[in-house]
Amino acid sequence: RFHGYLRVSLTERCNLRCRYCMPAEGVTDLTPTNELLTTREVERVINVFARAGASKVRLTGGEPTLRRDLVDICAAIKRDNPGVTSLGLTTNGMKLLSRSDGVRLVDALAQSGVDSINVSLDSLDADTFSRMTRRPASTHKRVLDAIDACASLGLNVKVNCVVLRGENENELAAFAERWDASVKLRFIEWMPFSGNAYDAKRLVPYAEMMTRLPHLVPLPSDDANDTTKWWTAGASQVGFITSMSEHFCGTCNRVRVTADGSLKTCLFGSDSVSLRDALRGGVSDLELGDLIQSALQKKHFKHGGHGDAAGVARNAFENRPMVKIGG
């Protein structure tokens, strides 16, 4: 299987404390800064993947906008890798409108070559947002404004919403009415990871989400590796990421590199290979590429080798917290 989509986490830190991701006190055993990939190491890893054919790169976290060299990394990716045709960012949007030398971060990112921004937003209600993120309700508008700013720049914008029973499952129709086709929506099934207190009773499966959005029309996809099931709802495009109820492992072409340089071939798998240690041990780019290919050849068929969704949940403690993997 060819893996043309690389997701690189730039940091384990986050400025939110979302209930489905981590405890209120956050993840307390974050990796020391000197053990995270440096700017140059991030760029080198991406260059090796790009030369092997990766054409799509997404930068994640933690919260990637907390990393001061973010814009420089984006510019280097586009400068050094003409084969990278899509450069994306997944963010909570809290810092996109912050300014440095009078320039908004979102504008600097667009100028550096970022063409796709996914913004995490789990509620249109400020109080629900506050409860789910454990942050003040006053910050809710900041995220909404950031989404609109991304759309106004002509970026490919998606809103990612994790649907959680008892919190936001009644908002799906409101989300579909909030934006036109310039902002795509993706509703995500809650997934189990170490430290996120996963409770299967609070999972809202794809089939149930569908009942909350009447008049959906299926939208054919020309991307065989797309993990999202796409539909139209009026003027909106609505997608579902169904990792727990209907896996898409057979067509997954994604590979992840964590902020500490660990290569993970599956989001749910506990297996990893340290590219950081190889880099700091003096390997050549060719040797690094061979190490990556060897790891990819051992990728499990589905669910990181845990059999099914129930197995993923049972073995979540073996995996990292989400902020230490990368969204």
Which sequence ranges carry the predicted segments?
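Radical SAM enzyme [4Fe-4S]-AdoMet core and its adjacent flexible, acidic
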Residues: 127-132, 136-239, 243, 277, ...
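Glycine-centered loop/turn positions within well-structured domains
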Residues: 16, 126-127, 247, 273
